[in-house]
Amino acid sequence: SGCRPVAGIFLMTGSNPVRLMAQGETSLAALREELNRIDNTLHDLIMERAAIAESVAASKGDAPVWRPAREAQILRRLIERHSGPFPRAALVAIWREIISAMVRLQGEFAIAVHVPEIDRNCRGLARDHFGGEAPMAFYGSARAVLTAVQDGSASVGVLPLPEDSEEAPWWTVLAGMSDNKVSVCARLPFAPSAPGNGEGAYCIAAIAPEESGSDNSLFALRTSPQVSRARLNDAIAAAGIKPGRLISRPARQDDVSVFLAELSGFAGPEDARIARLIDPDDGIAEAAVFLGVYATPFDAADISNRGGL
């Protein structure tokens, strides 16, 4: 007997190899046997990947086990090379489970999730991103999530996307945390199944920012009350950065305005373009506090079709 590649698979065809599939004569039993072989191969590769993940953990030492920029690069590469009828959304979901399981193999990994009174689906977004087996604790306040990440009791915190003019927004607390190594490092969902419906979350962690190749940066900008959104956007663009969303804190009597600025591209804490915004002579802002960098998520259109056809 022998085996013969047919339409990308190997079929056992007996003593005289023939293109049974082309002739429409492939038996269901033969196809099922081939699927079993593929399943075994996939399982072998997952076990091999897990062994490598353990070796990576040994090489990392005390380095953080979670690298969201690296995860984004993996998923982008897979979507780029994908073809055939298998749904892209399902491909991402499978790899998210695999990646998250591998992260947990490398060390302690706990997630703190903010679940406010008005549910904004942080719980569901966290489950979808980090997997059904990821250990999670749920908190009624954003400040508790920030504290859990800062003191190390949680590896990652999940907080709802800020909205304009929120009272006591969590991002101002993050900006005011002294000697802070915690920053935003991911945005959820990374692979939305439908166009944006307003639901979303940021992940925070005590890890150094890394470039993924397509990123967005977050800064808290303190300005005088006379600075309008339009003027601030113009100044950001003049500094060489493409502006994104501007979220404002409600006006107070301390004679300052504070904006959460979402900027296109990677900009770290010492970025020269940010320094232009706070230049004492002609800068528009009195201070700029780095809040984080996250890999740009997929658009729903990137993964909405059934496959790569």
Annotate each PLM feature:
Residues 10-309:
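Domain-level signature for soluble enzymes in the chorismate/prephenate branch of the shikimate pathway
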Residues 6-7:
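Acidic, Ala/Val/Gly-enriched low-complexity intrinsically disordered segments
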